[in-house]
């Protein structure tokens, strides 16, 4: 019975890794679409978001099956409960990537704005998602806590991007100013992705220690 349960837990890990990879790919495609003004890449993000939604459903079904058909001990129960919480944030990562793609699809792209800081934000946020899922699978508390710390890095990048673009808007009217507003929204979505990765890392911490940050007084 325990061997069967362990096999299902391993399947849960594999499905979470797959969902994390889908999230990371969605962020990457959204960033590529932004850099290249590529409608094709933006449409791929929409498809990826649908795949992420399906992955959430599959994992939720597996977790409920584990809870109902098995008798998990406290540590296993924390692991399954954390997975159920994590997939909610991972699904929202897909939504945020899709929101970025929507901006690219609905707005014209100008070549006037350089966006290296937004690309840097995107790479940092994607890495946070990847590391948070890996921390869960590897039961790596140190890595989970590093993800939480990196949220401050993305927050700082967002403030820098926002300040730069607000100054740009003050000096430029018309299409370029509108595009700068869109880029602020993109940066905000990336900041939210980092927040979701942090939430995932906090649930990883709970799965390992039994303590969740929100419950600490």
Go through each PLM region and give its residues.
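Cytosolic, long alpha-helical scaffolding segments
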Residues: 1-217
């Amino acid at each position: 019975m325990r061997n069967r349960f362990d096999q299902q837990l391993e399947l849960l890990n594999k499905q979470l890794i797959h969902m994390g990879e889908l999230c990371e790919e969605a962020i990457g495609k959204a960033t590529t679409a932004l850099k290249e003004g590529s409608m094709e890449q933006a449409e791929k993000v929409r498809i990826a978001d649908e795949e992420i939604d399906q992955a959430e459903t599959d994992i939720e079904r597996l977790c409920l099956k584990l809870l109902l058909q098995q008798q998990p001990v406290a540590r296993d129960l924390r692991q399954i409960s954390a997975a159920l919480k994590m997939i909610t944030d991972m699904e929202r990562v897909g939504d945020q990537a899709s929101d970025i793609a929507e901006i690219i699809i609905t707005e014209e792209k100008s070549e006037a704005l350089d966006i290296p800081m937004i690309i840097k934000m995107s790479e940092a946020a994607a890495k946070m998602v990847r590391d948070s899922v890996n921390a869960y699978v590897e039961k790596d508390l140190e890595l989970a806590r590093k993800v939480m710390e990196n949220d401050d890095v993305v927050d700082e990048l967002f403030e820098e991007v926002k300040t730069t673009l607000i100054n740009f808007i003050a000096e430029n009217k018309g299409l370029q100013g509108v595009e700068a507003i869109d880029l602020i929204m993109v940066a905000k979505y990336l900041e939210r992705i980092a927040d979701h990765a942090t939430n995932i890392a906090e649930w990883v911490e709970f799965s390992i220690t039994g303590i969740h940050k929100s419950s600490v007084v």
